From Swiss-Prot:
SUPFAM superfamilies: Metallo-dependent phosphatases (SSF56300). This is Uncharacterized metallophosphoesterase YkoQ. GO terms for cellular component: membrane. Pfam families: Metallophos. It comes from the Bacteria. One of its GO terms (molecular function) is UDP-2,3-diacylglucosamine hydrolase activity. InterPro entries: Calcineurin-like_PHP_ApaH, Metallo-depent_PP-like, Metallophosphoesterase_sf. A divalent metal cation 1 binds at D53, H55, D83, H209. The keyword RNA-binding does not apply. Belongs to the metallophosphoesterase superfamily. It comes from Bacillus subtilis (strain 168). A divalent metal cation 2 binds at D83, N116, H207.
Length: 270
């Protein structure tokens, strides 16, 4: 009887795992359009390519595949919202993905913030990670901002450090900020609950992986903050009428499977 039950379990479980692993290769390319609400004359839109949570320990998409997924749209800005890796041996691997993104020739550059997994690294290894990003054309932001002049007008790219590891400094990130479109990059979207007193036009984040194993419900995310309990774990949401986006990410943590979620790259038209 035990042998029969074991055989049945294997017959069910092996195809399930196979499909769950295949899901990690089935990348969805989303396009999100954010309407202008500032009351000013209509301006030219910018196209932002947003990637999050590469988790190079468990990524099923090669740099070449990433390039082919994204090459058919013009790119103005590339935004990377953290959790590149958590093991130092994978730092060199990141360069291949950054080179693929540079081939897209973003008109106004590539920008990155860090996530909780990046901070698992020892300080010297974290600095190596940061160096690889910067040597491959990426501007890293840790509670700071940069201002860029675009065909759509000035854009302030505000990079707020990871909220889940208590590294966020909202006040410091906004210090001496001038007028313009305020685009916030951060890893953990829970930070929006502490941003009611500051303005942003759009915020990009990741962290939750869309649940990764979202079946029947992503109960394992409960410990990851209030937004989960508000059923905000992926996609476009509004808080106090301000839009923010939670990417499902490109890689996986733990086991390299996805159930009820898929890896994502997103184009945001702002």
């Amino acid at each position: 009887m035990f042998t029969i039950l074991l055989s049945l379990a294997i017959l069910v479980f092996v195809p399930f795992l196979y499909k769950a692993n295949r899901n990690t290769k089935d990348v969805k390319v989303n396009t999100i359009s954010i309407d202008q609400k500032d009351g000013l004359p209509a301006r030219k839109k910018l196209n932002i390519l947003h990637l999050s949570d590469l988790h190079l320990e468990n990524i099923s998409v090669s740099p070449e595949e990433l390039y082919h997924l994204t090459k058919d749209q013009p790119v103005d800005i590339i935004a990377l919202t953290g959790d590149f890796l958590d093991r130092k041996r994978n730092i060199p691997k990141l360069a291949g993905y950054l080179n693929a993104l540079q081939k897209l020739k973003p008109a106004y550059g590539m920008y990155a913030v860090f996530g909780n997994h990046d901070y698992v690294l020892k300080e010297e290894d974290f600095q190596r990670l940061k160096r690889v990003l910067e040597e491959n054309g990426c501007i890293t932001l840790q509670n700071e901002h940069v201002r860029i002049e675009t065909a759509a007008g000035p854009v302030n790219i505000i990079g707020i450090d990871d909220y889940s590891t208590n590294r966020s400094n909202i006040t410091g990130s906004y210090q001496s900020l001038e007028n313009g479109y305020h685009l916030v990059l951060t890893h953990d979207p829970n930070i929006i609950l502490d941003m009611k007193d500051v303005h942003y036009d759009y915020l990009l984040s990741g962290h939750f992986h869309g649940g990764q194993i979202h079946w029947p419900k992503p109960y394992h995310l409960v410990k990851m903050g209030k937004l989960v309990r508000m059923n905000m774990i992926k996609g476009l949401h509004y808080h106090h009428d301000k839009p923010f986006y939670i990417s499902e990410g490109l890689g996986q943590t733990g086991v390299n499977i996805r159930v009820g979620s898929r890896p994502e790259v997103t184009f945001h038209q702002i």
